[in-house]
Protein backbone atom coordinates (compact mmCIF):
# COMPACT_ATOMS: atom_id res chain seq x y z
CA UNK A 1 0.00 0.00 0.00
CA UNK A 2 1.08 3.58 -0.56
CA UNK A 3 0.79 6.46 1.91
CA UNK A 4 -2.85 6.95 0.84
CA UNK A 5 -3.56 3.28 1.69
CA UNK A 6 -4.06 2.39 -1.96
CA UNK A 7 -2.92 -1.01 -3.19
CA UNK A 8 0.22 -0.93 -5.34
CA UNK A 9 0.15 -2.86 -8.59
CA UNK A 10 3.06 -5.12 -9.49
CA UNK A 11 3.65 -2.88 -12.51
CA UNK A 12 3.73 0.34 -10.44
CA UNK A 13 6.78 2.44 -11.44
CA UNK A 14 9.54 3.34 -9.02
CA UNK A 15 9.24 6.82 -7.54
CA UNK A 16 11.88 8.54 -5.43
CA UNK A 17 10.60 9.03 -1.88
CA UNK A 18 7.63 6.69 -2.28
CA UNK A 19 6.48 5.32 1.08
CA UNK A 20 5.34 1.71 1.00
CA UNK A 21 3.45 -0.10 3.76
CA UNK A 22 2.92 -3.81 4.11
CA UNK A 23 1.25 -6.18 6.54
CA UNK A 24 3.64 -8.77 7.89
CA UNK A 25 2.32 -12.29 8.37
CA UNK A 26 3.68 -14.78 10.86
CA UNK A 27 3.20 -18.51 10.53
CA UNK A 28 1.99 -20.19 13.75
CA UNK A 29 2.08 -17.06 15.88
CA UNK A 30 2.19 -18.06 19.58
CA UNK A 31 -1.00 -17.44 21.52
CA UNK A 32 -0.70 -15.52 24.81
CA UNK A 33 -3.63 -16.60 26.95
CA UNK A 34 -3.08 -14.08 29.76
CA UNK A 35 -5.22 -10.95 29.59
CA UNK A 36 -4.22 -7.33 30.07
CA UNK A 37 -6.02 -4.99 32.49
CA UNK A 38 -6.91 -1.40 31.65
CA UNK A 39 -6.04 0.70 34.70
CA UNK A 40 -7.10 4.07 33.27
CA UNK A 41 -8.44 5.51 30.03
CA UNK A 42 -9.45 9.01 28.98
CA UNK A 43 -9.43 11.13 25.82
CA UNK A 44 -5.64 11.48 25.87
CA UNK A 45 -4.04 8.43 27.49
CA UNK A 46 -4.57 4.76 28.26
CA UNK A 47 -2.72 2.98 31.07
CA UNK A 48 -2.71 -0.81 30.83
CA UNK A 49 -1.21 -3.56 32.96
CA UNK A 50 0.51 -6.07 30.69
CA UNK A 51 0.81 -9.75 31.57
CA UNK A 52 4.06 -11.68 31.28
CA UNK A 53 5.04 -12.91 27.80
CA UNK A 54 2.86 -10.42 25.88
CA UNK A 55 4.89 -8.01 23.68
CA UNK A 56 3.99 -4.33 23.74
CA UNK A 57 4.31 -3.93 19.96
CA UNK A 58 4.67 -6.30 16.99
CA UNK A 59 8.14 -7.86 16.80
CA UNK A 60 9.68 -11.16 15.82
CA UNK A 61 7.13 -13.96 16.01
CA UNK A 62 4.38 -11.67 17.29
CA UNK A 63 2.07 -9.50 15.18
CA UNK A 64 -1.49 -9.87 16.49
CA UNK A 65 -0.66 -11.08 20.00
CA UNK A 66 0.57 -7.72 21.30
CA UNK A 67 -0.67 -5.23 23.86
CA UNK A 68 -0.94 -2.51 21.22
CA UNK A 69 -3.09 -4.64 18.91
CA UNK A 70 -5.37 -5.76 21.73
CA UNK A 71 -5.94 -2.21 23.00
CA UNK A 72 -6.45 -0.76 19.53
CA UNK A 73 -9.24 -3.30 19.02
CA UNK A 74 -10.72 -2.79 22.47
CA UNK A 75 -10.95 0.99 22.08
CA UNK A 76 -11.45 0.96 18.31
CA UNK A 77 -8.57 3.44 18.11
CA UNK A 78 -5.90 2.94 15.45
CA UNK A 79 -4.11 6.06 16.76
CA UNK A 80 -2.99 4.37 19.99
CA UNK A 81 0.79 4.56 20.42
CA UNK A 82 2.88 3.32 23.38
CA UNK A 83 4.89 6.14 24.97
CA UNK A 84 7.45 3.67 26.33
CA UNK A 85 7.99 -0.08 26.35
CA UNK A 86 8.77 -2.90 28.72
CA UNK A 87 10.25 -6.29 27.86
CA UNK A 88 7.99 -9.11 26.71
CA UNK A 89 8.96 -11.13 29.79
CA UNK A 90 8.19 -8.23 32.15
CA UNK A 91 4.68 -7.61 33.49
CA UNK A 92 3.21 -4.29 34.53
CA UNK A 93 2.22 -0.80 33.47
CA UNK A 94 2.51 0.70 30.00
CA UNK A 95 1.33 4.22 29.13
CA UNK A 96 -0.25 4.84 25.71
CA UNK A 97 -1.13 8.03 23.86
CA UNK A 98 -4.71 7.89 22.59
CA UNK A 99 -4.80 11.28 20.86
CA UNK A 100 -2.31 12.40 18.18
CA UNK A 101 -3.07 16.05 18.97
CA UNK A 102 -1.70 15.77 22.51
CA UNK A 103 0.85 12.99 21.97
CA UNK A 104 3.87 15.28 21.93
CA UNK A 105 3.29 16.76 25.37
CA UNK A 106 3.04 13.30 26.91
CA UNK A 107 6.12 12.10 25.03
CA UNK A 108 7.97 15.04 26.58
CA UNK A 109 7.40 13.55 30.04
CA UNK A 110 9.81 10.76 29.14
CA UNK A 111 12.21 12.85 27.10
CA UNK A 112 12.57 15.40 29.91
CA UNK A 113 12.53 12.76 32.67
CA UNK A 114 9.42 14.17 34.30
CA UNK A 115 7.85 10.78 34.82
CA UNK A 116 8.60 8.55 37.81
CA UNK A 117 8.71 4.80 37.25
CA UNK A 118 9.26 2.13 39.87
CA UNK A 119 9.64 -1.60 39.41
CA UNK A 120 9.48 -4.52 41.81
CA UNK A 121 11.88 -7.44 41.37
CA UNK A 122 12.49 -10.69 43.22
CA UNK A 123 16.14 -11.73 43.35
CA UNK A 124 18.74 -13.26 45.68
CA UNK A 125 19.78 -11.27 48.78
CA UNK A 126 22.52 -8.65 48.65
CA UNK A 127 23.50 -8.39 52.33
CA UNK A 128 26.80 -6.72 51.52
CA UNK A 129 25.23 -3.53 50.14
CA UNK A 130 23.86 -0.50 51.95
CA UNK A 131 20.44 0.57 50.68
CA UNK A 132 19.25 2.58 48.92
CA UNK A 133 22.06 1.73 46.54
CA UNK A 134 22.82 3.52 43.27
CA UNK A 135 24.29 1.42 40.47
CA UNK A 136 25.84 3.17 37.46
CA UNK A 137 27.54 1.53 34.50
CA UNK A 138 28.06 1.73 30.77
CA UNK A 139 25.73 -0.54 28.80
CA UNK A 140 26.38 -1.58 25.22
CA UNK A 141 24.96 -4.26 22.89
CA UNK A 142 26.25 -7.73 23.69
CA UNK A 143 26.12 -11.21 22.18
CA UNK A 144 23.82 -12.20 20.70
CA UNK A 145 22.44 -8.91 19.44
CA UNK A 146 19.39 -8.83 21.72
CA UNK A 147 21.40 -8.90 24.96
CA UNK A 148 23.18 -6.03 26.67
CA UNK A 149 26.43 -6.01 28.63
CA UNK A 150 28.31 -3.79 31.03
CA UNK A 151 31.64 -2.48 29.77
CA UNK A 152 34.38 -0.06 30.74
CA UNK A 153 33.67 3.59 30.04
CA UNK A 154 31.59 6.59 31.03
CA UNK A 155 28.35 5.37 32.66
CA UNK A 156 25.24 5.81 30.54
CA UNK A 157 22.82 3.97 32.84
CA UNK A 158 21.71 4.49 36.43
CA UNK A 159 19.36 2.59 38.74
CA UNK A 160 18.37 3.33 42.34
CA UNK A 161 17.85 0.06 44.24
CA UNK A 162 16.10 -0.41 47.58
CA UNK A 163 14.75 -3.38 49.53
CA UNK A 164 11.06 -3.67 50.39
CA UNK A 165 10.98 -7.23 51.78
CA UNK A 166 13.62 -9.67 53.00
CA UNK A 167 13.13 -13.43 52.80
CA UNK A 168 15.50 -16.31 53.43
CA UNK A 169 16.33 -17.14 49.81
CA UNK A 170 15.08 -14.05 47.99
CA UNK A 171 14.46 -10.35 48.59
CA UNK A 172 11.96 -8.08 46.91
CA UNK A 173 13.63 -4.98 45.51
CA UNK A 174 12.25 -1.62 44.48
CA UNK A 175 14.05 -0.43 41.35
CA UNK A 176 13.95 3.11 40.01
CA UNK A 177 15.52 3.47 36.55
CA UNK A 178 16.97 6.97 36.30
CA UNK A 179 17.86 6.18 32.69
CA UNK A 180 16.02 3.89 30.32
CA UNK A 181 18.54 1.62 28.62
CA UNK A 182 17.47 -1.70 27.12
CA UNK A 183 17.39 -4.48 29.75
CA UNK A 184 18.93 -2.02 32.22
CA UNK A 185 17.35 -3.39 35.39
CA UNK A 186 18.05 -6.99 34.45
CA UNK A 187 21.70 -6.31 33.61
CA UNK A 188 22.29 -4.19 36.72
CA UNK A 189 20.85 -6.80 39.10
CA UNK A 190 22.82 -9.59 37.43
CA UNK A 191 26.00 -7.51 37.61
CA UNK A 192 25.52 -7.12 41.36
CA UNK A 193 25.30 -10.88 41.75
CA UNK A 194 21.52 -10.99 42.21
CA UNK A 195 19.96 -11.88 38.85
CA UNK A 196 16.19 -11.45 38.80
CA UNK A 197 14.38 -14.71 39.41
CA UNK A 198 13.63 -16.71 36.22
CA UNK A 199 15.62 -14.37 33.95
CA UNK A 200 16.35 -16.31 30.75
CA UNK A 201 18.88 -13.76 29.42
CA UNK A 202 21.07 -12.79 32.39
CA UNK A 203 23.60 -13.53 33.66
CA UNK A 204 23.75 -16.35 31.09
CA UNK A 205 21.58 -16.91 28.03
CA UNK A 206 19.47 -20.02 28.53
CA UNK A 207 18.49 -22.39 25.75
CA UNK A 208 15.35 -21.31 23.93
CA UNK A 209 12.22 -22.99 25.24
CA UNK A 210 8.48 -22.32 25.35
CA UNK A 211 7.23 -19.70 27.80
CA UNK A 212 6.52 -21.22 31.20
CA UNK A 213 3.60 -19.50 32.99
CA UNK A 214 4.78 -21.11 36.24
CA UNK A 215 8.20 -19.45 35.96
CA UNK A 216 7.71 -15.88 34.71
CA UNK A 217 10.44 -13.30 35.10
CA UNK A 218 9.95 -11.75 38.53
CA UNK A 219 10.11 -8.17 37.31
CA UNK A 220 7.09 -5.88 37.44
CA UNK A 221 6.58 -2.31 36.20
CA UNK A 222 4.77 -1.38 39.41
CA UNK A 223 4.04 2.36 39.45
CA UNK A 224 3.88 5.33 37.09
CA UNK A 225 3.56 8.89 38.40
CA UNK A 226 3.68 12.31 36.75
CA UNK A 227 2.08 15.74 36.73
CA UNK A 228 -0.45 15.77 33.92
CA UNK A 229 0.85 18.16 31.23
CA UNK A 230 -2.71 19.23 30.35
CA UNK A 231 -4.36 19.69 33.74
CA UNK A 232 -1.27 20.06 35.93
CA UNK A 233 -2.76 17.56 38.38
CA UNK A 234 -0.61 14.77 39.84
CA UNK A 235 -1.31 11.33 38.35
CA UNK A 236 -0.29 8.03 39.90
CA UNK A 237 -1.03 4.50 38.69
CA UNK A 238 -0.28 1.13 40.30
CA UNK A 239 -0.06 -2.25 38.57
CA UNK A 240 -2.59 -4.97 39.25
CA UNK A 241 0.15 -7.61 39.21
CA UNK A 242 3.19 -8.06 41.42
CA UNK A 243 5.39 -10.60 43.19
CA UNK A 244 2.48 -11.89 45.27
CA UNK A 245 0.00 -12.19 42.38
Where would I find each of the regions flagged by the language model?
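RNA pseudouridine synthases
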Residues: 1-245
Amino acid sequence: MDAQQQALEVSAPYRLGLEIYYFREVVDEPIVSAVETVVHADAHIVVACKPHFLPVVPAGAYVRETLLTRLARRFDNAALVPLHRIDRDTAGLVLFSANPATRGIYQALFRERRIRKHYLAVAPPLPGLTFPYVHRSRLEPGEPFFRMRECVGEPNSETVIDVVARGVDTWTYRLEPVTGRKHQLRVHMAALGAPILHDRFYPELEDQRPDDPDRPLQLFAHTLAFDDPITGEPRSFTATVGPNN
